[in-house]
Amino acid sequence: MKILVTGATGKLGSKVVESLLKSNPASNLVVSVRNPEKAEELRNRGVEVRQGDFDRPETLDHAFKGIDRLLIISADGDNETRIQQHANAVQAAKRTGVKFIAYTSIANATESKNLMAPPHVATEAAIIKTGIPYSFLRNNWYLENEIGSIQGAIAGAPWVTSAGEGKVGWALQQDYADAAAAVLVGDGHENTVYELSGPLLTQDELATALGNVLGKDIPLQQVSDEQYAEIMKSLGLPDFVIPIVVGIQESIRNGSLEVESNDFEKVLGRPVTPINEALNQLVNLIS
């Protein structure tokens, strides 16, 4: 059985590959990357490295050839670009006879008002249309997304948010990677939708948990979206990023990530890493 992971040199993709290598021979594993030179270390460990670029569909036919089980990791970029890139990958999977597609989606994708949901809605629909058995891994929110705020808190800054009492199912990328690996090698995942959500917490509860890890109080600063935009600008975020980060706060406030589910533990076969332990890992990583 040949398994392929796209975006295998990215933050999530590299963790999925490492998770797979713990229990699977390297000879069963193929990675598809835009720049094969970046995957030289994997090649040296016996993993087959192929070039695959979501912007160049002709490269994907070669990349996906002979693959049984495929993980499409959602790309970065604006919504329109991502929709086209993902469509290219899905069509190539169909052309090359891939037998199973796992795809990293977003929480509650089909009903989500999250500004990042449209590419996931389009991609899930495109995969279903192929008739290929699938599993949608609806990843809630990476704890790593909060590293900037964690660094600020370590340096003495307050935890700034305009997300109000909106709840998030934060978890470590490693947990999401382990879940993806489990679906790629496990049985019974055909035509499934998994809501991969950690225990739901508000921003205040996350800041309190971080304070427990750091051994100090972290003041919470609830602001308006307009104030949040100004603060982000003052921290040096580029102008084009500001509406995105504000939109994320707004969608959290409106409950787009408030998805309660035990799918994560079911897929992992273990509990999600507890939030204090997860925060401790990130704090150690930063310092």
Task: Annotate each predicted stretch with a short phrase.
Residues 11, 226-287:
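A hydrophobic C-terminal alpha-helical subdomain
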Residues 43-55:
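Rossmann-fold cofactor-recognition segment
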Residues 6, 73, 104, 269:
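Residues lining the SAM
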Residues 4, 50, 268:
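Conserved Rossmann-like nucleotide-binding pocket used by diverse enzymes
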Residues 64-69, 283-287:
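Compositionally biased, low-complexity linear motifs
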